[in-house]
A protein has these predicted regions:
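Phosphate-backbone binding interfaces of nucleic-acid-interacting proteins
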Residues: 2-216, 330
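Conserved mixed alpha/beta core segments that line enzyme active sites in large multi-domain catalysts
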Residues: 51-79, 271-330
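Short acidic, glycine/serine/threonine-rich loops at helix termini
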Residues: 62-65, 102-114, 141-144, 189-190, ...
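Residues forming anionic-ligand binding surfaces in small-molecule and nucleic-acid pockets
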Residues: 160-179, 219-258
Length: 330
């Protein structure tokens, strides 16, 4: 299985202008089978960026608050039970008559979404609703900054009144492909984009890479040993200095989410991004934690146990290839 976002494909085929159904039919006919697609903005209507101007307690409900919210062309009153909002927060607001994709509990999404209408909560009028990630139809596990419960807080520099769905990168379509083993070139977005360019007879534009480096030799810092050339023909390493961990840019997080990869931080996200883009697996290691400053590629021992990132201890066998440092599997 391979997923790509249409916007990511268009980054390399800028003149591509097709509907999701046209894309699906044409790509499948030319041999790149599309199993289906998902429109990320399905049932998301009239949702804008709002800024909370004031908050006061509800006179008749301890768990409700009354917010005055600037939504661009007007100020509206919204009653909410969200525990995590503050004055000055920018939030997604669905206006009267708009739609959200689901409920706040993250359960199955209703086919036609949920219509939002102005009404009264315990006697106080409310003219819209502030949205959680669940209500936007998204999996909060792919939004590292999303609260476990409550409203999703947008970046401080978000423009009040602008399209919140566009801001979150949800005006997009994600396609799922069935890639056969003889087309490993299509296990990356660039391979899919190349196929799309050929299918629709459009210009294919490779991303520009500005390689930077210096005269230092990687071998002065790190050694790589491949002990099994049958399973691993080549292993390459580079050393990157002066790293500062931080969140990756919003555009990168949006593309990763669209293809089913959870954003973590700038370093992990860059390696996952390149993997999704080129189909080339990558991994970043902390140099200071790499015993002997060495990478050893070898088969696992029969019955060897290894705890993976999900916290599960797995029993390995000799047909599994492992990456180790000088002392242990990493």
């Amino acid at each position: 299985r391979m997923d790509t976002a249409l916007s990511w494909v268009k980054a390399y085929v800028p003149d591509l202008d097709v509907t999701p159904s046209e894309y699906t039919d044409a790509m499948t006919l030319t041999g790149t089978k599309v199993e289906g697609y998902k429109e990320l903005d399905k049932n998301l209507e009239k949702i804008v960026v709002g800024e909370i101007l004031s908050i006061e307690k509800h006179p008749d409900a301890d768990k409700l608050i009354i917010c005055q919210v600037d939504v661009g062309n007007e100020k509206i009153q919204i009653v909410t039970g969200a525990p995590n909002v503050s004055v000055g927060d920018k939030v997604p607001v669905v206006l009267d008559g708009g739609k959200v994709a689901g409920g706040h509990d993250g359960g199955p999404l209703p086919e036609n979404g949920i219509k939002i209408k102005k009404g009264k909560l315990r006697g106080v009028e409310s003219f819209g609703m502030m949205c959680s990630i669940d209500e936007l139809g998204q999996d909060k596990n792919y939004f590292p900054d999303a609260p476990e419960s409550g409203i999703y807080i947008l970046p401080k520099d978000s423009k009040v009144g602008s399209d919140a769905i566009e801001l979150l990168g949800l005006r997009d379509t994600v396609f799922e492909y069935e890639i056969t083993s003889n087309r490993v070139d299509c296990y990356g977005v660039i391979g899919i984009a190349r196929e799309a360019a050929a299918t629709f007879k459009k210009k294919f534009v490779l991303p520009k890479v500005n390689e930077t480096g210096n005269s230092e030799n990687v071998a002065d810092y790190l050694s790589v040993e491949v002990k099994d050339n049958e399973l691993c023909k080549r292993y390459i390493a580079r050393v990157v200095k002066n790293i500062k961990l931080a969140p990756s840019p919003a555009w990168m997080q949006e593309r990763l989410r669209a293809v089913g990869i959870r954003p973590i931080n700038n370093i992990v996200d860059i390696t996952n991004y390149v993997m999704a883009e080129y189909g080339q697996p990558m991994h970043a290691f902390d140099y200071d934690l790499l015993e002997g400053h060495k990478i050893v590629v070898d088969r696992a021992g029969d019955g060897e146990e290894f705890e993976t990132l999900d916290g599960v201890v797995r029993k390995l066998d000799k047909d599994i290839l492992m990456i180790n440092d000088a002392k242990k599997a990493v």
